[in-house]
Amino acid sequence: MPILALQPARLPLAAALSLCLLPTTRAFAQDGATTLDSIQVSGSWLGTGLHDSVKRFAGARTVVDRQRIEASGAASLGDAMRRIPGVQVTDNSGTAGSSVSLNIGVRGLTGRYSPRSTVLLDGVPLAVAPYGQPQLSFAPTSLSNIESIDVVRGGGAVRYGPQNVGGIINFSTRAIPTEAGLHGEAGVRYTAYDHGGGDSTQYNAFLGGTGDNDLGAALLYSGQDGRGWRQGSDDRFNDLALKFAYAIDEQQELRAKLSYYDVRSLTPGGLTRAQYEADPFQNTRPTDFWKGHRTGIDLGYTNTLSANSEFEVLAYYNESTRASSLINAANTQLTVQPRDYRVLGIEPRYTQRLHWGSAVHDITAGYRFLRERGNDRSYTVARRTGAASATARFDNATDAHAFYIDDRIATGQWRITPGVRMEWIDMDRRQAGGATFSSRNDKALPSINIAYLLTPQLTVFGNYTTSFGPVQNIQLNSQTASNPLNPEVAKTTELGARWQDGALRAEVTVFKMRFDNQILQVPGITPPTFQNIGATDHKGVESALEYHFAEDGALAGLELYANYTWTKAIQQSGDNRGLDVPFYSRDTDSIGARYALAGWTFNVSSTHQSGQFSDAANTWAESADARVGRVPGVRLWNAQVAWQVPGLGDSEIALGVNNLADKRWYTRNVDGNAGRMVAAPRTFYVQGRYRF
């Protein structure tokens, strides 16, 4: 496979597969007892209206909309996701607390740089290399431009991949207004920390509308400048997008998005136990930083061919660059690691509704071609002289083909969806002046989702899904004829129920996941060697409850919510068999209340996580360098009051305090800048939004 070529390969195969999907089968009469969704694109990341209903979705799924995000007082994507059952924000990386990365773990899976979930932005993979480097050490998006967060923890492995063991997370940017005229918003948020001396300002702007010619456009901007709660933790970013939509006619629509993102964060890193006790907010690594930028274009086309069929195609291309600089323990040498990536993807999808007797089949088939090209470079710089070493370089190339098909069968109150996803992956990693490491893998991922609509309010569901994680670029170096690496495989089973009526929303899910064949580094071997030797077992219960009091009652305007998750993730291989997986909490919960009265809104909420281990050996005692040891649990309280300004429509001013009790808590970082990482102290913020 040529490393530097970027033109799509095997696209005739994609076209052939797409044409083969066009059905010629005549539809039969529909049983009137079966109530169905219409086939129409609704903007959901799931692509077609057939699967858009969270209420009827046959798997654990949570959607957080913009109103709830704003009421939570969240300043980042990680903050906003703490209310989602089964999701843990670990912040155990060297960039924790900055805007450059995202650290999300689902159901006890590792959260460092979110490597186990398929993370999407408007349906497009967010990772700089979805197959070769799925880690979000560089996460090019920001909270203020997001309309909703959709987290599918189970039941989505057929449609989306490749890293779907930890479910699917989609961030949807703000939609283009469909009404005539201009609509917009301008906002600013000022944040100050009670300790550490830091403050920051976030800005956001939105302007858009749709003309009489059915052409819609929107401009989205979000930015930040300032410093976090650690000394020398300067943090700034710019997030810009320009979106277009054009309705060709009643059946056809074109969509496009141009995007740009840049970020630069100074990263103080971890502290030893003695350093933390002296001053937890100090910075002993003032030269460390991470930075990155990304430009991209997304194109989409949808054709609702008839009341029973729909065709959609999504194409995207993006270029990303990220770099880091970390000083060594002796404080004499900087290691600089610049990396460049290019990703091209195209995905056609076709849906056909067929009526066979009393059953109705919504058959969806799709194909995705994804091409990655990039390089990893590394060199050192002497701090005293500035002299740089020779640069080590690896060039990476991946061509991946995925074909999927599922059939959503509706018969009576049953919704049964069998499906399968096939992946074919070609990967090369070439060392400059050295050897080339290659991997050729294919995998079939069968799944079945079942939902029963017991009443109009209650859905009972269950599913069995097969998920996988491909071999990553850095792991190819250790592959030999006697040590071939294969994709990681996980098998997940869910049972759950979801209730939704005008006042009450509730859900509970029981899950069990067996994650075998994990690629792990073999201890005690130099140079680093990876093998398929890892296995973990994950099980738990996720629950959520939300209640809105009646508008004509004494408690009108009051909303209460709570969620609780119990997870047990155990290692099943090696010397630590039977011990907990590092960096997850067995118990997490959140509770809160929202009360609206006469233009005022009051919010109070709390999040809790139990203690966790920072190493596979489950070491309780803390080492002097604070790299290992038990991480204590914590409960935090937040409060916010917002006032809707009279005469200015939906505009408002809000004041809030996060970590009301000023709890001093920390996590651990096990990277090259390891140690205790103090979390945010009591935090004050004021924000204003003007909407028109």
Q: Model-predicted segments: where are they?
A:
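Gram-negative outer-membrane beta-barrel transporters
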Residues: 350, 357, 413-416, 512-514, ...
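C-terminal beta-signal and adjacent terminal beta-strands/loops
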Residues: 558, 610-617, 642-692
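Transmembrane beta-barrel wall of Gram-negative outer-membrane proteins
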Residues: 196-225, 229-268, 289-304, 357, ...
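Short acidic/polar hinge/loop motifs at secondary-structure boundaries
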Residues: 124-153, 242
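Surface-exposed extracellular loop regions of Gram-negative outer-membrane beta-barrel proteins
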Residues: 264-266, 270-279, 371-384, 426-431, ...
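Extracytoplasmic beta-strand/coil segments of soluble accessory domains associated
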Residues: 78, 82-125
